[in-house]
Amino acid sequence: MKEIIYNYDNITEDDIDRKVKRTKIILENNEGNILIVKEFDAYQLPGGHLEPGEDFNTALVREIKEEAGIDLEYKERTPILKIRYLKKNFPNKDENTAFIGYYYADKLEPQPDLNKLNLTFMEQNSNFELGYIHKDYIIKELENNLAITEYKNTVSDTLEAIREYLK
């Protein structure tokens, strides 16, 4: 598994006060289309934050059901990518945070009903869209999106995961 660490503040693990964990997945259907979320103006993979007591795979199953209406099978998946951001004084002064994201990949069968979503209030109010982009075009779409979005880290992380998956 590839791991990327962003630590612009040069803080150590001992400096971390809290950890925010999230899990995302690349889901490819039989036609080579990859399920993608567009929220605000940023492309990203479906997934989200872990709730207390959840492991990464449990959170992944829950998030995919909420965001995409897909009953993803619970199984031990091996991540293809881990991205960590270590941030000093975030979100508050004297609080250092580690953002830890694990990225997985799986085949998508059967085709989900994209109209059966259980979105959070925030997702409902963020122009949340779910759709497909073919794997032959997704890198270019993400690069184009990266050039115009305010959410550069989100799109950049998605691009890293897709590149890792497609290599």
State each model region's role:
Residues D71-K82:
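A short coil-to-beta-strand element that immediately follows conserved catalytic motifs
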Residues N29-E67:
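Conserved Nudix-box catalytic region and its N-terminal flanking loop in Nudix hydrolases
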Residues Y43, P112-K167:
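Nudix hydrolase/Nudix homology domain
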